[in-house]
Curated annotation (Swiss-Prot):
Enzyme class: transferase
Chief site of localization: cytoplasm
Cellular component terms (Gene Ontology): cytoplasm
General function of this protein: Converts seryl-tRNA(Sec) to selenocysteinyl-tRNA(Sec) required for selenoprotein biosynthesis.
A GO biological process held by the record: selenocysteine incorporation
Annotated protein name in UniProt: L-seryl-tRNA(Sec) selenium transferase
HAMAP family (UniProt xref): SelA (MF_00423)
Catalysis performed (reactions): L-seryl-tRNA(Sec) + selenophosphate + H(+) = L-selenocysteinyl-tRNA(Sec) + phosphate
UniProt keyword list: Cytoplasm, Protein biosynthesis, Pyridoxal phosphate, Selenium, Transferase
Length: 469
């Protein structure tokens, strides 16, 4: 074993090999020397462990020139940015793990400008005095939704927390038992309510809640009625929930604010494209609840944000809550949100320019044509290394939206000749950029719904790299 340890090259020898262009690989001369040295030391430590475990038993395999290819791969992998672009071939439009909604070009341009230049973030250009960051989006938000006033924080969970902390702290909030949803990451509505200082008063049964359940629960401690839209799941069969307009009428009669957590939220009706009818933000505002919260980065197709709209008397109270400062959005989110809201002033323009909307409303015929183009490109790029074809399939909206509806699509099927589809899927996670797809029927499949035409070339490159071509 000692002779194997002695056969390991020195750190300096490997550093020289890594930074010398004559070795036929990309050099790492631009990396900080201290970082490069640490990465080489880590690589050598791993080889020492291989020796101890008996995985290496030939001194010649430890020569610098033999180790260099795996060292280059190791350093390249560990020195690149950790937060990276990914090619989404899954067909899940609002993929929570892959960053949810893509921003429209107008929004990305606005973000770039906000990052690169000073701005009037909290400066009133009319008076030359300090202004409010919310003034850039509140009027737009009200115009699009029809609400009296609006506010934006950093996500919808924060919006719900802020609303409950402002209006309900120390009191009881009445909510249907069937609406106590988990919103992802193990965060649940009851947990958010507990943190706000409000006391939860559950009414009804899991599958059925009546107006009388709310009426009977109201007492001297009641401070609000809460309704949570179950956008991330559906109860079917023997089921009943109280319509929003009836709950609003009860709130008015008992002088209690009605809060609607709309979850995903949407400004468009998607029924013309085969999706089930979901309440739009505008229709919910029209029903008259006092406060409505919803997300900015799901069906809306904007940045991560929690949007709060409603009657001015309540929104003004929420704005004055000191917690609002801790939850406020930054200038990049603000820039992206304003640009996205401006697109919604013309709904058809929004449908064409907001990527999430464009992907959700793509027709089956269009997707079939694009799948055939992608398949043809992959056949040319991969040759005999894989069998490429197209098959019918389904996409999903994702992001906790439209949970019960599949979207028809055409999938591109890749069956590698030299490895299993599972191995191919794993290798594709290490390409640049990584390509994420689906495993179905022992094949690797890609959905063109979530791949832009300009991404077809890097998809082909990633597959060639993963197959060693």
């Amino acid at each position: 074993m000692n002779r194997l340890f002695r056969a390991l090259p020195s750190v300096d020898a490997l550093l020289t090999a890594l930074t010398t262009p004559t070795h036929g690989h990309d050099t790492f001369a631009d990396l900080p020397r201290a970082l490069l040295r640490d990465l080489v030391n880590d690589f050598l430590d791993a080889r020492r462990e291989d020796i101890r475990q008996g995985r290496i038993d030939a001194p010649e395999s430890l020569a610098a020139e033999r180790l260099l290819p795996s060292l280059v791969q190791s350093v390249g992998r560990r020195s690149r940015a950790h937060f990276r672009r990914v090619l989404n071939g899954t067909g899940v439009v609002i993929h929570t793990n892959l960053g949810r909604s893509l921003l429209a070009p107008a929004a990305t341009e606005a973000v770039a400008a906000a990052c690169a230049h000073y701005s009037n973030l909290e400066f009133d250009l009319d008076t030359g005095e300090r202004g409010s960051r919310y003034s850039h989006v509140e009027q737009l938000l009200c115009r699009v939704t029809g609400a009296e006033a609006g506010l934006v924080v950093n996500n919808n969970a924060a919006a719900v927390l802020l609303v409950l902390d402002t209006l309900c702290k120390g009191g009881e909030v009445v909510v249907s038992r069937g609406q106590l949803v988990e919103i992802g990451g193990s965060f649940r509505i009851p947990d958010v309510m507990e943190k706000s200082g409000a006391t939860l008063r559950e009414v009804g049964a899991t599958n059925r809640t009546h107006l009388r359940d709310y009426e009977n629960a109201i007492n001297e401690k009641t401070v609000a009625l809460l309704r949570v839209h179950t956008s991330n799941y559906r109860v079917v069969g023997f089921h009943k929930e109280v319509p929003l307009d009836e709950l609003v009428a009860l709130g008015r009669a008992r002088d209690l604010p009605v809060i609607e957590d709309l979850g995903s939220g949407s400004f468009l009706d998607f029924t013309p494209w085969g999706l089930p009818g979901e309440p739009t933000v505008q229709s919910v505002v029209g029903a008259g609840p006092d406060v409505i919260t919803f997300s900015g980065d799901k069906v809306l197709g904007g940045p991560q944000a929690g949007l709060i709209v409603g009657r001015r008397q309540w929104i003004d109270r929420i704005k004055r809550n000191p917690l609002n400062r801790a939850l406020r959005i930054d200038k990049m989110t603000l820039a992206a949100l304003e640009a996205t809201l401006r697109l919604y002033l013309d709904p058809e323009r929004a449908r064409n320019e907001v990527p999430t909307l464009r992907m959700m409303t793509a027709s089956p015929d269009e997707l079939a044509r694009r799948a055939r183009r992608l398949a043809a490109r992959l056949r040319k790029a991969l040759g005999d290394a894989a069998r490429v074809g197209t098959v019918p399939g389904v996409s999903r909206v994702g992001g906790g939206s439209f949970p019960e509806r599949d979207l028809p699509t055409t999938l591109v099927e890749v069956a590698p000749a030299s490895c299993t589809a599972t191995v191919l899927k794993t290798r594709l996670l290490d390409t640049d950029p990584p390509l994420v797809g689906r495993l179905e029927n022992d094949t690797f499949r890609l959905d063109p719904r979530t791949l832009d035409d300009v991404e077809f070339a890097p998809v082909a490159t990633a597959l060639r790299q993963a197959l060693g071509l």
